Design a protein with these regions (language model features):
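Compositionally biased, intrinsically disordered low-complexity segments
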Residues: 5, 9-20, 110, 132-134, ...
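First exposed extracellular module after export/assembly in secreted or surface-exposed proteins
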Residues: 31-300
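Bacterial Sec-dependent N-terminal signal peptides
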Residues: 2-5, 12-42, 48-51
């Protein structure tokens, strides 16, 4: 009789313990636990829904950073300044070029058309990310990698490359390494300037080059690069707007005269591309050599 009673009693005790554990399990709120404002939590879940998995939420001074895994299983980071969302970065799997299957098809095709080869993504500093910024009209896709120089010795010699593609699959730039976008999350001042100076423009992407912000815009169908100078304390001052001219665009007579004088001392110089550079000091024209990376500038 005693043996028969032991089993039901054990079962009852286990059920009570399980019920108690379920009842007293703490309601873990990672935002509250690390002092992240309720306003940020509310905005975050309105922006990304409760289907994402938040892995970290931290506030330091006036900056908050929320790390999470989205519904596609990709690691993301949202950055807030005060209670205002500034940007979100989504990371794609760089190993084995897995990102080519994770990216939107038009972005993957644009990357393959960019003309780069022998990319090495196993480098610690390499990455493939999607960047969404406050005030920008489009998302941007950044690819950071290295290419080993086979003509150099030792074989460890390499060059860093950065490819920038906009949301519609247009190649915006191929250049050397720049600062990580997440370090320069606030470009609101530069956005305000572009909205005033180029009211019809579409803001496509933004990067930071040696502390200077660079915005890529499409203004009346023309792709332009808007550069700013860093003045400290997040202040950026416009320095130049640069864009390539079409082959049929005529150069000002003053530029043609200066080019003729230049050719007297540099008879082998011929240009294949022309860039218009707008600055506070006036308009310049950059004539890019047809055979080298040299660009010669003449003031209009």
């Amino acid at each position: 009789m005693i043996t028969r009673l032991i089993h039901p009693i054990c079962v009852a005790v286990m059920l009570i313990i399980a019920s108690a554990c379920e009842k007293y399990e703490p309601d873990w709120d990672i935002f509250e636990a690390y002092g992240v404002a309720e306003e940020i939590k509310t905005d975050f879940y309105e922006r990304y829904s409760e289907d994402v998995k938040v892995t970290s939420a931290v506030t330091s001074y006036n900056k908050s950073q929320v790390e999470f895994v989205d519904t596609d299983g990709l690691k993301c980071t949202a950055v807030y300044k005060g209670h205002t969302w500034m940007m979100t970065q989504k990371e794609f799997n760089k190993n084995g070029f897995a990102f080519l299957k994770q990216l939107p098809e038009r972005i993957a095709k644009a990357y393959l058309r960019a003309g780069v080869s022998k990319e090495f993504y196993e480098w610690d500093q390499s990455y493939v990310i999607e960047v969404t910024r406050r005030g920008f009209d489009k998302k941007a896709y950044e690819f950071q990698f290295v290419v080993f120089d086979e003509n150099e010795f030792p074989k460890l010699a390499y060059r860093e490359y950065f490819v920038l593609i906009d949301e519609d699959g247009e190649l915006l730039d191929i250049r050397s390494r720049h600062n990580r976008s997440i370090w320069w999350y606030d470009m609101s001042g530069c956005v305000d300037f572009v909205r005033q100076k180029y009211p019809e423009a579409t803001i496509l992407a933004g990067i930071n080059d040696s502390s200077d912000n660079v915005l890529y815009i499409k203004d009346k169908g023309v792709l332009k690069t808007v550069r700013f100078d860093y003045r400290g304390s997040d202040e950026q001052t416009w320095s130049a707007t640069i864009y390539r001219l079409e082959d049929y665009d005529k150069l000002p007579d003053t530029v043609l005269d200066e080019y003729a004088k230049y050719r007297v001392y540099h008879p082998d110089f011929n240009y294949s591309e022309v860039y218009r550079v707008e600055t506070k000091d006036g308009i310049y024209y950059g004539l890019k050599s047809a055979t080298t990376s040299l660009t010669v500038y003449f003031k209009a």
